[in-house]
Amino acid sequence: MQKSPREFPRRGHIYTADLDPAFGREIHKKRPVLVISSDVFNRGTPFAVVIPISSIIPDVTGPEMVEIGKFKGLDKKSILLPLFIRSIDQKRLHKKIADLPKEKLLEVEDALKLVLGMVSLD
């Protein structure tokens, strides 16, 4: 994503991103991602912290996954995968395709707390 001085990816926006090359079982290829890093971070650095989105939904999902369904910009029922959170160069971001609804962003934050050990699983 080429950014002008005022343009930067914003928290809660969904972009297509190229996650290749990847190693081992990391999420890869061109796919939608959710920008989860703060606007201050995104504006002040060339990086963005993102969570990959997949349209392949397992039969059994856990609290570390967030189903986001299908909405404008995402034409397939999809799932966010906070376990695969990563920092990427903003140049990997391509087209903005959607905004994640606020209530879903709160679910993502809860899932991230589990993944990062910020809350107990008990």
Predicted regions and their residues:
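Conserved functional hotspots at enzyme active or ligand-binding sites that engage polyanionic ligands
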Residues: M1-D122
